[in-house]
Amino acid sequence: MNRSSRRTFLAAGAATAAAGTVGGEASASTYPRLVHHVFFWLKNPNSAEDLDKLIAGLRTLKKIDSVRGIHIGVPASTEARAVVDSSFSASEILFFDDVAGQDAYQEHPIHKQFVADCSHLWERVVVYDAVSV
């Protein structure tokens, strides 16, 4: 086997082995059971300053004890399709162990401060909460 075909063989073998470790369903025991996904539409959607303020406020939420993980993002430049809504300004996904953790988050002083500091920036908020099955 020459060096080039050996590398190809090893790369293919590694890719095959790796494929077994990704793409499967997450078990409820490995990941937090509740996802809190929030979409924000800014009053001034073209204001980079307002977006920066919102993102800075969202980042404070990771300090809350019951938050197991956080993802903050803006619309991706993916293919335009009828099922894709990229009209929002920013989104956050928070991960909790359970509903009690999400309830504690809602009442936490850091969350309340975030709302007090940033609610003037948005005109619309949509929340999707989901539990693992």
Regions found by a protein language model. Name each.
Residues 1-16:
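N-terminal secretory signal peptides and thylakoid transit peptides that target proteins
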Residues 2, 18, 128-133:
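A generic hydrophobic-segment detector
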Residues 8-11, 56, 60-66, 86, ...:
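An amphipathic, aromatic/His-enriched active-site/gating alpha helix that lines ligand/cofactor pockets
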Residues 21-49:
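C-terminal segment of N-terminal export signals and the immediately downstream linker at the start
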Residues 33-42, 73, 79-106:
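Short, well-ordered beta-strand segments in beta-rich or mixed alpha/beta enzyme
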